């Protein structure tokens, strides 16, 4: 199965690409949206700023949004999750808009959130085989889904409860970094690859 790892200047391409390959995916790193949408699945990496990443999206977001809404498997990680939403307080520019909602600054005493945190997961199959998830976070912003039923995982930081995961169709967003979250994180990536293979 061919997975497009989109390159908009995010900093974790190598580790994420390696984790995807270990899960059995053939990874193509690309900054061309036409090429990315021609693959079996799409991964939007994290570590970066919303403004430059949004600027790397096509001016017409509709083809990307429509491909994901039609069922193309996609995994957005950290910044990649934020790009799935409408827009962000961090910078001007529009996200893909697949998941209605906003991205806002964490109202915490210490920002960014850096380090390990408990994640309360639901029954979504992307968490299959993960009994108790402690994941690695590196974020200053949180995703606020307009429809709370899109949220599939939650975490708490400085008494702020935030969506740590969201899903629509075959698109998953994770605010934490599974590629940095030890064995449970690798299992989540393997689950995504398996789920994507089922529909590709």
For each predicted feature, which ranges?
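C-terminal and late-domain segments of enzyme folds
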Residues: 143-200
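Extreme N-terminal starter segment of soluble prokaryotic enzymes
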Residues: 1-4
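Structural motif
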Residues: 43-45, 173
């Amino acid at each position: 199965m061919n997975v497009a790892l989109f390159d908009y200047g995010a900093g974790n391409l190598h580790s994420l690409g390696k984790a995807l390959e270990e899960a059995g995916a053939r990874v193509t790193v690309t900054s061309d949206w036409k090429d990315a949408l021609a693959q079996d699945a799409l991964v939007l990496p994290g570590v970066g700023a919303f403004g430059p990443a949004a600027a790397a999206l096509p001016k017409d977001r509709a083809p990307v949004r429509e491909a994901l809404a039609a069922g193309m498997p996609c995994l957005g990680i950290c910044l990649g999750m934020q790009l799935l939403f409408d827009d962000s307080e961090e910078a001007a520019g529009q996200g893909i808009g697949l998941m209605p909602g906003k991205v806002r600054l964490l109202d915490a005493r210490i920002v960014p959130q850096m380090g390990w945190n408990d994640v309360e997961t639901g029954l979504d199959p992307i968490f299959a085989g993960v009994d108790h998830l402690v994941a690695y976070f590196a974020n200053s912003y949180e995703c606020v889904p307009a429809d709370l039923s899109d949220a599939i995982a939650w975490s708490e930081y400085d008494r702020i409860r935030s969506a740590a995961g969201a899903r629509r169709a075959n698109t998953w967003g994770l605010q934490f970094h599974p590629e940095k979250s030890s064995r449970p994180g690798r299992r989540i990536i393997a689950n995504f690859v398996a789920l994507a293979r089922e529909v590709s």
